[in-house]
């Protein structure tokens, strides 16, 4: 894929930083076989953007590593082109710098983004105080609903699947702007380790406890039925890491 790299991806870039508060994050996301690669590129960028925003920063620059499928050169070129078009469509909104890129072939295509940000809001896990409210910027459930989709759940209609994709295509920039305006903190990105694990980290750091009520309103399309039937790929690890810190008061509601 080296010849393809030369057309689309640079090897390196020089970035001039005027702030002394620099944030960096790296994130990888595996390709959803049913999704068009343009939207997947957008989702991969926004997935990484969440880490930067939750650190109280705005995106400055990024580098990408693209895992392309084992295919003929034209197919690889297709994925490379549309992955990057999706990524660039979101980076243009951020006015962020595309610094460098790399490609490789893989049985599990995916996108890794190393993203840099400039810190504009001091937010740390130990800043929660008693009486704080927990605000979710999006409904929960992408992990287990994607698992339900992959297992052909009869409860998961095309309309619900569209809601899942549309949720992933929404940036949290507007939510971050509100947090900045009202100096809300701490912030966290709950993708990956889930709401439970991230909230436990905040509570431990702030010497507090938190109370949650799971209801249909905070899950995409109210799909609680599939929650008991399907598990996300990270479910077991997340459960094992968090279960000793959680007290379930009523399992029926």
What are these regions (language model features)?
Residues 4-18:
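N-terminal short beta-loop-beta anion/metal-coordinating cradle
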Residues 17-33, 58-156:
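Glycine-rich anion-binding loops of enzyme active sites
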Residues 38-55, 88:
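Alpha-helical scaffold segments that flank or form the walls of functional sites
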Residues 40-44, 79, 83, 167, ...:
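Hydrophobic alpha-helical membrane-association signature
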Residues 71-97, 104-109, 181-187, 191-253:
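Glycine-/charge-enriched secondary-structure boundary and capping motifs
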Residues 113-123, 156-180:
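Active-site glycine-rich loop that binds ribose-phosphate moieties when present
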Residues 126, 137, 164-168, 188-191, ...:
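Glycine- and other small-residue-rich loops at beta-strand/loop junctions that grip anionic moieties
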């Amino acid at each position: 894929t080296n010849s393809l790299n030369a057309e689309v991806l640079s090897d390196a870039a020089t970035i001039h930083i005027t702030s002394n508060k620099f944030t960096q994050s790296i994130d990888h996301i595996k390709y959803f076989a049913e999704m068009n690669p343009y939207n997947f590129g957008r989702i991969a960028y926004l997935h990484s953007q969440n880490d930067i925003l939750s650190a109280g920063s705005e995106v400055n620059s990024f580098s990408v590593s693209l895992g392309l499928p084992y295919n003929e050169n034209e197919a690889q070129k297709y994925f490379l082109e549309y992955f990057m078009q999706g990524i660039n469509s979101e980076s243009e909104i951020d006015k962020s710098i595309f610094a460098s890129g790399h490609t490789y072939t893989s049985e599990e295509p995916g996108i890794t983004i190393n993203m840099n940000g400039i810190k504009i809001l001091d937010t740390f896990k130990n800043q929660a105080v008693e009486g704080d409210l927990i605000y979710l910027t999006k409904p929960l459930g992408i992990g287990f609903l994607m698992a339900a989709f992959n297992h052909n759940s009869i409860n998961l209609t095309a309309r619900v699947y569209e809601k899942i994709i549309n949720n992933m295509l929404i940036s949290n920039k507007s939510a971050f702007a509100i947090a900045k305006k009202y100096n809300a903190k701490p912030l966290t990105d709950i993708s990956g380790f889930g709401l439970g694990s991230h909230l436990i980290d905040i509570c431990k750091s702030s010497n507090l406890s938190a109370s949650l009520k799971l209801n249909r309103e905070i899950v995409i399309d109210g799909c609680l039925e599939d929650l008991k039937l399907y598990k996300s790929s990270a479910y077991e690890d997340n459960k094992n890491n968090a279960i000793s810190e959680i007290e379930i008061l009523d399992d029926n509601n």
